[in-house]
Amino acid sequence: MKKLEILNLRGNKIVDIKVLEKVNFKELKKLSLSDNKISDIKVLGKVKFEKLEILDLSQNKISDINILEKVNFKELKQLGLFNNNISDIKVLEKVKFEKLEELNLPGNKISDINILEKVNFQELKVP
């Protein structure tokens, strides 16, 4: 799977994604894990997706996104986290997604968005 560029696992019943740290996805550009039953994404701190541009974790059961502070996805342009259980987005102040253009957070439990004035995503597009 070294040359795999797109992995779409949308709409399954996936709960555990720890296997990602054991697989070599050097060329992966798009990973869709949306519409599953994932709640723990800590494994993302252990994987190396050097070319990942799109990560879709929407429609899962994710509540804790603090691991995003430790991931190093230099090429990430789109991050989908809509329809999860996220309430705290303070970690966004610390993440280093220099090329992020699109961040999708609708359908969560976020009540305080004041942190957004401190977020520095150089390429983020606002409609």
Question: What do the predicted segments below correspond to?
Answer:
Residues 34-35, 42, 64, 82-83, ...:
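Intrinsically disordered, low-complexity segments enriched in polar/charged small residues
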Residues 1-19, 32, 109-127:
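Low-complexity/repetitive intrinsically disordered segments
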Residues 4-9, 28-33, 52-57, 76-81, ...:
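Conserved hydrophobic beta-strand positions in leucine-rich repeat
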Residues 1, 17-26, 41-49, 65-74, ...:
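A structural signal for leucine-rich repeat
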